Amino acid sequence: MEKAPPLLDLAALDIFRTVAAEGSVTRAAERLSRVQSNVTTRVRQLEADLGTPLFLREGKRMALTPEGKVLLGYADRLLALAEEARQALQPGPPAGRLRLGSMESTAASRLPAPLARLHSQWPGVALELTTAATRVLVERLRAHALDAVLVAWPPGQPADPALETLPVFTEELLLVLPAGHPHAAGPDQVQPGTLAVFEPGCTYRRIAQEWFAPRRQPMQLLELGSYHAILASVAGGGCAGIVPRSVLSISPHAALLSQEPITTITTLLTWRQGYRSAALDAPQQVLVD
């Protein structure tokens, strides 16, 4: 009778994932509070069990092989499911690890007060906050790399049956223009002809581009990495932008800008269908209070 292959060990997968994240056995051992020889042995045993190298070893640097990259996706999901099972069997107040993703605008303008309440009320919740564009956050949520995300769905996009959502904020989006810019009744009245935007995958960028789509002379795009940079560029007179009012209200550039309301959009707390954890209860409570 053919011998069955060894079962994947969760502890070994956690070590593998940490080495992949750190790119070094030394740093992974420090992070895991293990001796280096133990980390090396567990990685080599995992490679032997799977019959394939998982890392390319370049001196002290460890880089994933193509097979290692495939395993990393499964490791993220298996470890997330194991943590979900552990929390489901230990009911009680919100506690445990929570990997929360958020749009940059929401993290800056909406989350400081709720997260302060979360830390005060439930110190047992270990929060890890990541910011990115909506499309990236949803991809990471589906891949089990995040537990929940705060995102804005593009208008007209149908609901995803694989995800659950909870409306938490309503954002008013504003067209912001250099100080003294006359009232813009439509996209053709906007000058200069450059639009400051976030990276592709940002819902607000998509809304901005759709609003300017009827313009006879297409807008040039200036891709920037933060709302501070977008607002500073608009204040400098070089471009227009579309930002949430909540972001503009905390910006030192607010008094230097003209503004026009464009539309409203809902920010949704989103998680995988059927996912339950004690830690997820915390943001669900503080964000709707």
Residue positions per predicted region:
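Central regulatory/effector-binding core of bacterial HTH transcription factors
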Residues: A95-P158
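Hydrophobic hinge/microswitch elements
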Residues: A133-V138, R142-L146, A152, G201-L257
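Interdomain hinge and pocket-entrance segments immediately C-terminal to HTH DNA-binding domains
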Residues: K60, P66, L89-A107, Q121-A126, ...
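Secondary-structure junction motif
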Residues: H183, G193-R215, S277-D281
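A late-sequence structural motif
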Residues: L256-D289
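Alpha-helical linker/hinge and terminal dimerization helices associated
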Residues: D49-L50, L71-G92
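A short LG(V/I)-centered, amphipathic sequence patch enriched
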Residues: Q45-L64
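Short helix-boundary/capping micro-motifs
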Residues: R17-V35
